[in-house]
Amino acid sequence: MEKFELHILGCGSALPTTRHFATSQVVNLRDKLFMIDCGEGAQMQLRKSRLKFSRLNHIFISHLHGDHCFGLMGLISTFGLLGRTAELHIHSPKGLEELLTPMLNFFCHTLAYKVIFHEFDTRQTSVVYEDRSMTVTTIPLQHRIPCCGFLFAEKARPNHIIRDMVDFYKVPVYELNRIKNGSDYVTPEGEVIANTRLTRPSDPPRKYAYCSDTIFRPEIVKQLSGVDLLFHEATFAESELARAKETYHTTAAQAARIALEAGVRQLVIGHFSARYEDESILLKEASAVFPNTILAKENLCISL
């Protein structure tokens, strides 16, 4: 299967700690890089990951709290120092362009590349990015300010040609695209060769969903149905349920309930409160509900 990876750059929450960087991730699909949130220190973690800066052209910001976007200015500036010329696209809720433009004009007015902002409505489910390989769709969340998650969905690929069978039936090259897309082949003599004899199914398309920050929100279960990997914030343990509700965050057990009801393959929890020096209690509570749960940690790479 072709590369589809999630790199965790940071998994902490608002209060800085010596154990965790602020929230930031990178999705690597076939060596195209997509950043999700850009907390303080994201560019340092990006260097540690050994991912190529030049392959990062799109950044998706879930909401305008500092622990999810304070790293943007530093990253934009560093791109300039590295001689970047390719456009950088930043997808975010309304307001980020207004906030960053004065700083860009002051600190980064000599950039040799364009920073292009794309704003979306966090209340709507909408496709905010699409190419030949993938779509990125917003997931409406409920936080103290407008916020959404993101669903990265690989597009279905054509069937694989069985070379020996194609050669055996002497299928012309110009017929191969039709056959890949499901058509049968008719020989010059009129014999119909079933597509199933000439192809094998491609690998099933994969999906990754990112949900942070949000109060427990069962409404998202339908959109998350069957995803291969779900990152869901788990800021608090169940003992802090009242605090989670008050701050519009989620407990580890609640995140696991979302994963269970959505039928996801694997759950990774993160956005840990600074009060926890050991997140094992969060893993224990989540795993009791959804066993295939792991803790996010810096420099973790997960292959889908």
Curated annotation (Swiss-Prot):
Residues of the active site are: D67
- Entries under InterPro entries matching the protein: Metallo-B-lactamas, RibonucZ/Hydroxyglut_hydro, RNase_Z/BN
Q: Give the transmembrane ranges.
A: none
Task: Kindly state what the record says about how the cofactor is bound.
Answer: Binds 2 Zn(2+) ions.
Q: Which Gene3D superfamilies match?
A: Ribonuclease Z/Hydroxyacylglutathione hydrolase-like
Question: According to the UniProt entry, what is the EC number of this protein?
Answer: 3.1.26.11
Q: Which UniProt keywords apply?
A: Endonuclease, Hydrolase, Metal-binding, Nuclease, tRNA processing, Zinc
The record's section on Pfam families has: Lactamase_B_2
| Lineage top rank: taxon | Bacteria
From the UniProt record, list the reaction(s) this protein catalyses.
Endonucleolytic cleavage of RNA, removing extra 3' nucleotides from tRNA precursor, generating 3' termini of tRNAs. A 3'-hydroxy group is left at the tRNA terminus and a 5'-phosphoryl group is left at the trailer molecule
Which residues bind Zn(2+) 2 per the record? Answer: D67, H68, D213, H271
- Assembly and binders: Homodimer.
Family matches, as HAMAP family:
RNase_Z_BN
Family classification: Belongs to the RNase Z family.
By what name is this protein known? Ribonuclease Z
Organism this protein belongs to: Bacteroides fragilis (strain ATCC 25285 / DSM 2151 / CCUG 4856 / JCM 11019 / LMG 10263 / NCTC 9343 / Onslow / VPI 2553 / EN-2)
Q: Quote the gene name from the UniProt entry.
A: rnz
